[in-house]
C-alpha cells in the first residue's frame, strides 16, 4: 500500500538521465518563452491556447467537444453551449483566473487551487470531507489505488504540498523536476471529489509561471498526455508500486520538450496567418484596418459586435460596419 511521502522527497531524483533530459526541456522552454515575446499581442495566444488546452485536458477525462461548439460557447454563453462545451469553457475560465491570481499574489496557495477547482466544477465545495474515494482501472474496474480518506489527512498533505510549491528553500531540485513531483503528489492526494486531473494540470502550468519559466500560461501538456494516456497512468502508478520516480520525471520532461516545440510551431503559424490577413485587410479594406482590429479577429475565432466595441473603443454602428465590410470582403 502506497504511503504518500512528506515533501521534499528524501531519495535522489535528479539522476543522470533526468539531468540530461532537463537540458533539452529547459532549452525548448526558453525558446518558447522567446517565441511568445515575438507575438504582437500575447492575449491572442492566451485565448487561443487556453481554449485548446481546456478542450484537450477535458478530453483526458472523456469530456469531448468540438472547436466549433467551444467557440460558440465562448461567444454566445449558454445560448448554444452543449453540456460538454460548458465544462470545457469552465476549465478555460479557471485557467485564466488562476493565472491572474498567481501573478497578483506571486504565490500558488491552496485557496487559489480551491478557487480553480470551484470554477472547473462550477460548485462551492472544497477538499473532500467524506470517505469512499478510490481510483480504478478504466478497463477492469479493479481498484488500483486508495487516496487519503479523511479530511484531516487531505488537509495535512495539501498543507505540505502548498509549502513545497511556494518555499524554494525546502528543496534545491530543478523547478521542472519539482513540477513532476508536485503533479504526482497532487494526483495521489486526490483532494477533490471530482475534477482532480483538470485542476492538477492547471497547477502544472501555473507553477511554471510562478517560477518565471514562462511569462504566460502557454505550455499545455494535455495533448501529450492524451497521446500517451496509457503510459501516463502506468508511470503514475509505478511510482506508487515501485518507487520509480525517474521514469515518471523523464516522461513529463519529454512532454515539456515536445509540447514546447509544438507550441513554437503553432506560434509561427499564427504569426504567418496574421501577416497574411494584415496584408489582405490593408490592401482591400484600408479604411477599417487597424492592428487592434486584427488582434481582435485572432483573439476571438468567432467575434461579435460587443467584442469590437469593447476592445477597439468604437460605437456599435462603427463595429457593425467593420464586421459587415469584413464579411463582404471575405465573400468577394
Q: What residue ranges belong to the model's regions?
A:
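FIC/Doc superfamily catalytic core
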Residues: 1-332
Amino acid at each position: 500500500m502506497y504511503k504518500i511521502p512528506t515533501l521534499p522527497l528524501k531519495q535522489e531524483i535528479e539522476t543522470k538521465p533526468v539531468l540530461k533530459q532537463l537540458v533539452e526541456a529547459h532549452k525548448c522552454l526558453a525558446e518558447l518563452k522567446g517565441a511568445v515575446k515575438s507575438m504582437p499581442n500575447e492575449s491572442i495566444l492566451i485565448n487561443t491556447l487556453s481554449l485548446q488546452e481546456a478542450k484537450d485536458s477535458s478530453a483526458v477525462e472523456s469530456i469531448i467537444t468540438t472547436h466549433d461548439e467551444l467557440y460558440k460557447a465562448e461567444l454566445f454563453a449558454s445560448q448554444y453551449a452543449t453540456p460538454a462545451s460548458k465544462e470545457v469553457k469552465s476549465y478555460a475560465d479557471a485557467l485564466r483566473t488562476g493565472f491572474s491570481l498567481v501573478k497578483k499574489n506571486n504565490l500558488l496557495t491552496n485557496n487559489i487551487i480551491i478557487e480553480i477547482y470551484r470554477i472547473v466544477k462550477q460548485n462551492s465545495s472544497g477538499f473532500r470531507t467524506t470517505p469512499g474515494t478510490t481510483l480504478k482501472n478504466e478497463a477492469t474496474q479493479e481498484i488500483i489505488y486508495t487516496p487519503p480518506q479523511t479530511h484531516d489527512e487531505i488537509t495535512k498533505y495539501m498543507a505540505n504540498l502548498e509549502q513545497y510549491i511556494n518555499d524554494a528553500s525546502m528543496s534545491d531540485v530543478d523547478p521542472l523536476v519539482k513540477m513532476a513531483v508536485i503533479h504526482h503528489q497532487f494526483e495521489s492526494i486526490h483532494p477533490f471529489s471530482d475534477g482532480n486531473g483538470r485542476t492538477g494540470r492547471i497547477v502544472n502550468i501555473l507553477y511554471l509561471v510562478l517560477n518565471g519559466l514562462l511569462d504566460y500560461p502557454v505550455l499545455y501538456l494535455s495533448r501529450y498526455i492524451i497521446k500517451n494516456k496509457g503510459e501516463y497512468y502506468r508511470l503514475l502508478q509505478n511510482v506508487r508500486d515501485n518507487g520509480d520516480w525517474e521514469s515518471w520525471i523523464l516522461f513529463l520532461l519529454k512532454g515539456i520538450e515536445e509540447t514546447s516545440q509544438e507550441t513554437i510551431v503553432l506560434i509561427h503559424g499564427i504569426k504567418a496567418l496574421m501577416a497574411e490577413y494584415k496584408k489582405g485587410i490593408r490592401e482591400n479594406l484600408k479604411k477599417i484596418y487597424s492592428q487592434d482590429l486584427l488582434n481582435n479577429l485572432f483573439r476571438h475565432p468567432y467575434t461579435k459586435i460587443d467584442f469590437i466595441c469593447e476592445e477597439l473603443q468604437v460605437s456599435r454602428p462603427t463595429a457593425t460596419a467593420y464586421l459587415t465590410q469584413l464579411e463582404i470582403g471575405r465573400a468577394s
